[in-house]
Amino acid sequence: MADTTVDKLATEVGKSTERLVEQFSQAGIKKSASDTVSETEKQQLLDFLKKQHGGDAAPTKMTLQRKSVSTLSVAGSGGQSKDVKVEVRKKRTFVKRDEAAEAELAAAAKAEEAKAAEAEAKAKAEAEAKAKVDAEAKVKAKAEAEAKAKAKVQTEKPAAETAEDKAAKAEEAKLLAAQDAVAKAKANEEASAAADEARRLAEENEKRWAEEEKARKEAEKSVDHHVTTSTEARAAEDTADANAEKRGRRPRKPSANAGNNANANAGAGKPGGKGKRGKDNRRDNRNSRNSRNTRSVAPESMDHAFTKPAAVVKAEVSIGETVSVAELASKMSIKATEIIKQMMKMGSMVTINQVLDQETAQLVAEEMGHKVILTRENELEHQVLADRNGDVKVEPRAPVVTIMGHVDHGKTSLLDYIRRAKVASGEAGGITQHIGAYHVETENGMITFLDTPGHAAFTAMRARGAKATDIVILVVAADDGVMPQTIEAIQHAKAGGVPLIVAVNKIDKPEADPDRVKSELSQHGVMSEDWGGNNMFVHVSAKDGTGIDELLEGILLEAEVLELQAVREGMAAGVVVESKLDKGRGPVATVLVQEGTLKQGDIVLCGLEYGKVRAMRDENGKAITEAGPSIPVEILGLSGVPSAGDEATVVRDERKAREVALYRQGKFRDVKLARQQKSKLENMFANMVEGEVQELNLVLKADVQGSLEAIADSLNSLSTDEVKVNIIARGVGGLTETDATLAAASNAIMVGFNVRADAQARKVVDSESVDLRYYSIIYQLIDEVRDAMSGMLAPEFKQEIIGLAEVRDVFKSPKIGAIAGCMVTEGTIKRSAPIRVLRDNIVIYEGELESLRRFKDDVSDVRNGMECGIGVKNYNDVRVGDQIEVFETVEIARTL
């Protein structure tokens, strides 16, 4: 980090260098303009300036308010008394001493403490010195007495020892012992007196210090009577309240019938019975007085029943599949902040409303010491789906065959020949844009066909077709070979584990090459039985019917090998192949029945929707009443349009079906919300990198759910770094007034695929000038959206050389300056176009023409092979041999 000088710091803070040096000097830091400033010195200067300007001043005044409510019994008219509530409000203002007064008082207190300590030490030293002197005097007197006694004994000692001498010695020893005892007693007495004296001095000092402390406190109170503590103020107020209550209370006479609880309680409710019960039960007295005419009840206790738990309460926490932080905290009887803290310790940042999955919630609860019980919120769903037929008879069923392949390879035409109907001509543009489900009766049995689109946009449709099928027929044109959607169909079949039969179509064409098809398919793992593989190859022609019978026989043979079986009787189950919103009939779903028999009037649970089957139709539009396994059928009566690929199940109870559908919808919303609540940080950085991106807003409506998904995926794939497709609304059904209003508000294009706008929507379109477009072929829709996105791209500019002139001579003009006499060697020289001057094929100047003349006449252009005079604006260094290049900038439209 580079050092900061005073001059640089002054520039940063917007002050003059002299002023900053002066402020440093006032803060006790000597600096010059060229000196460096450390972070510590900056902080020191900042603290000084804050203190000088009062930035860290604390509040010096505080006001406390207290309110107490009591009840006073007042005699009224007619000898009756009434209760009057008395409210007492008290207000105290506490003012903090200023710093000077506080410092002065603190210094005085410190001096008093030092003085007291010095006096105590002095008294202790005096007592110790006196005790020491007394002890030394006693020892000296004892030694002198012993010496005198010894000298006396030695002088009076006779030469021979007699009995009298022994008696004298004994008496002398007794005397000495008595003297020693007297000396010891005297020494003990003197020591005790010295200790008493020291104790007396200490007590006097303590008494004197207490008096001085009392005097100091009185002096402080006299200085400022507001200086006190909130505890003392509250205690004084409580004492005053208690004295006032005692003065206004009369003693209660003892009850005549003390054993009667009812009388005792009634007496306690009278005004004269307040004295004995005390302050804690005044509320009971007021309640009794307010309800004189009602039956008396036992006085309730004012004590709360809560006891502080001795240990952490460990509860059993029931956790579902998803739970929010607030809900988990409520179940654990703790604050949500505790869970947030715990998850921060575990390395995860969450908010109080964030949804946690079951595993994360279990870890948090167990970490905090609770017992976790995992529950399944979809228990009702499992019960409803499990409440079906038990042991039922299994019978063989017809195979479900999906026809897949590249676009225009003849899938639908092949199915046409089998069904003896012209289906392909009915599809817009001659291409299939829906999943068509049909069943045909042959001599050897029934076969159900699913015809999937071959266009690249319908990947999801083909995946659903492969999922619901038993056998896949891969149609490959003999004259075209393997194409991208052919490879994709092979991948779908392998992913689903479905056997594959290859139908080599268009075998009647002269350019057909079946061997090339076999060779190309072998590179993708599809080997012919002729080459030792497992896949059946059949050469067919949808035009003249060649090989159709062999294909049907191969399908039935493969189905016999697979031993396809299903429950024929009982409650039906199937899969939604396609769905749409019909304006006259409502939500319509094409369901392929996989087991059981679907009957009119059954309760169907289908994904997020449910309903009673009001009507059933086959693929030809004829009304039917029931449909068995492997039969495609259109059903009416659902609550909404289900998604293609949802499972359709017949249940017993409509109420439970509605509950399961609502639960699924709520779960879908929760999952969507949890997906939206993911960390925004990555999105923020991604948006910063993207910069300004053009957006093409679309409101998309289609006739069926599958086409809607395919179109939306294809349009989203067109997005680039510069232009993005934003589908703000999508749905199945016609364009409504709501769609038109939304498109007008968001400046979007309304796109209808095989649907139309109603009258109200057309009015909004006309009044708001909304761009409304109808399409029936997906190719056209994608191409036009791509063209619209291309128009939003920033254009590119290219410079094109339109003329070249060579300088043959240079003339001087008094008005313009140097005039170059030139010969046009290439193209045309235009007066309005920019130029470059080249010398030895190097650009030395770029500018514009000031004049262009031919024979003294101003002209707008000069063509190839003609002479002219050229005056270059703001440039006079034109020489013979230079070249003047004329160019123009051309805008080139970009495409995706």
Swiss-Prot record:
Gene: infB
GO molecular function: GTP binding; GTPase activity; guanosine tetraphosphate binding; translation initiation factor activity
Region (G1), start-end ranges: 405-412
Region (G4): 505-508
Organism: Shewanella pealeana (strain ATCC 700345 / ANG-SQ1)
Disulfide bonds listed in the record: none
Residues covered by region (G5): 541-543
Domain tr-type G: 396-563
Biological role: One of the essential components for the initiation of protein synthesis. Protects formylmethionyl-tRNA from spontaneous hydrolysis and promotes its binding to the 30S ribosomal subunits. Also involved in the hydrolysis of GTP during the formation of the 70S ribosomal complex.
A Gene Ontology term for the protein's cellular component: cytosol
Lineage: Bacteria, Pseudomonadati, Pseudomonadota, Gammaproteobacteria, Alteromonadales
Identification of the protein by name: Translation initiation factor IF-2
Domain of life (superkingdom): Bacteria
G3 as annotated region, ranges: 451-454
Family annotation (Pfam families): EF-G_D2, GTP_EFTU, GTP_EFTU_D2, IF-2, IF2_assoc, IF2_N
